[in-house]
Amino acid sequence: MARLFGTDGVRGVANADLTAELALALASAAVEEVADRGTPPPGPVDGVPVARSAHGIDHRPLVVVGRDTRPSGEFLEAAVVAGLARAGADVTRIGVVPTPAVSYVVAATGADLGVMLSASHNPMPDNGIKLFAAGGLKLPDDVEDAIERRMAGPAARRPVAAAVGRVRDDSMLVDGYVDHLLATLPGGPGGLRGLRVVVDCAQGAASDLAPRVLRAAGADVIALHADGDGLRINDRSGATHLDSLRDAVVAHGADAGIAHDGDADRCLAVDSAGEIVDGDQILALCALALAERGELERGTVVVTVMSNLGFHHAMRDAGIDVVTTPVGDRYVLEAMRSGAYSLGGEQSGHVVFLRHAGTGDGLLTALQILGRMAETSQPLHELAKAMTRLPQVLVNVRGVDRARAETSDELRAAVADAEAELAGAGRVLLRPSGTEPLVRVMVEAPTDELARDVAGRLADVVQRALR
């Protein structure tokens, strides 16, 4: 049986793969596993006080639940809440919020578990369930595996009478998240006065909060795709479709553009000329800023195997060490925690500032980018020169057996030939997706033409060898 949890929770087409029955069963199993473990939380995110003990023999588990704007989120939330309450957990619903808001509220309230209903950047028919442990960190793999075993085992004895969980709504808890974000801004609240910013909310979870936070920080804000229309979430908008943001930044004469995905755990940017500033460039400029302030713990940044070689060269030249992990912000976070590092992230725009958040936070990242612009009086295109990108081509090969990607002799030989052709001046990476049925072919080379040529040939081999 395939593992239920992927690299970022459970995902699938809502009401087909991800059903109400599955959501209910998963929620109950998660509460039972967390309650039985009774493990103390790793502590709150720095600066986030724990307001409630999460432990004790007679303790009733507390769970925080949020969702994005997808229509399917409504019935899935109902199923999740039912599963939590029938297992004896008290539930606090905080409404439509970014994923990192759930992480923050879990830490701030001392909750035992957090549940976010979102499929992030995936299209509208999909949805997902992300789980956060006490302290606001994502559940480790071994806990997810234990939850799956519970789901496959005999039903647990259910509480009755006064022992069943209670449910309440408290969207006001999100105000604390907003205050927390503003407190991280270099220069303090109001520090973005004089900056005009276009923010693309992808019709997702940030549709209300992103413009609100930026305005509270003093920016002149033009909100794009911010109606909260879940039927159009991520539809030609947000962090995976930057064309409309690029056009809007130029049309409005804005200093910068900010793009979030459906659950706002990622952030990409656009400079005043409409040029894209990706996650690697954001990490580079933030690393230099933190190093300058003496806040880059152990002089190290954590990235994934997808980060551009140009990033590694820039950090080397700046005297900053780089730790590399598999793809997935959970693995970045694990490396950051184990090494006591303060900054890490992915090229896709997941950036983790561990002094302020327990997960990637798009709104927090936007404030750090814009705050650096205000702090230095430099335009974004100048700050983005913190690194020079090597041409990189990414090809998604669909309709193949991704499970065989690491065992195919034909594919292994093709990769070896490509690496020999690049002769150390570039690199090749083949990676089965952890969230979608495809294999990604990534090639970096001294020229765009060579990168495209090598990537195209490798993609053909993947299609032939793995079909």
Swiss-Prot record:
Names of required cofactors: Mg(2+)
A Pfam family per the record: PGM_PMM_IV
GO BP term, pick one: carbohydrate metabolic process
Keyword Nucleotide-binding appears in the UniProt entry: no
Highest classification ranks of the organism: Bacteria, Bacillati, Actinomycetota, Actinomycetes, Frankiales
Residue positions of the active site: 120 (phosphoserine intermediate)
GO MF assignments: magnesium ion binding; phosphoglucosamine mutase activity; phosphomannomutase activity
Family note: Belongs to the phosphohexose mutase family.
Enzymatic reactions: alpha-D-glucosamine 1-phosphate = D-glucosamine 6-phosphate
Residues the record lists as binding Mg(2+): 120, 261, 263, 265
Modification after translation: Activated by phosphorylation.
Keywords, ordered alphabetically: Isomerase, Magnesium, Metal-binding, Phosphoprotein
Gene3D superfamilies reported in the protein's UniProt record: Alpha-D-Glucose-1,6-Bisphosphate, subunit A, domain 3, Alpha-D-phosphohexomutase, C-terminal domain
Enzymatic class: isomerase
InterPro entries: A-D-PHexomutase_a/b/a-I, A-D-PHexomutase_a/b/a-I/II/III, A-D-PHexomutase_a/b/a-II, A-D-PHexomutase_a/b/a-III, A-D-PHexomutase_C, A-D-PHexomutase_C_sf, A-D-PHexomutase_CS, Alpha-D-phosphohexomutase_SF
UniProt KW Hydrolase keyword: no
Entry-annotated residues carrying Phosphoserine: 120
Record note on cofactor: Binds 1 Mg(2+) ion per subunit.
Physiological role: Catalyzes the conversion of glucosamine-6-phosphate to glucosamine-1-phosphate.
Gene Ontology CC annotation, any one: cytosol
SUPFAM superfamilies attached to this UniProt entry: Phosphoglucomutase, C-terminal domain (SSF55957), Phosphoglucomutase, first 3 domains (SSF53738)
Protein name (record): Phosphoglucosamine mutase
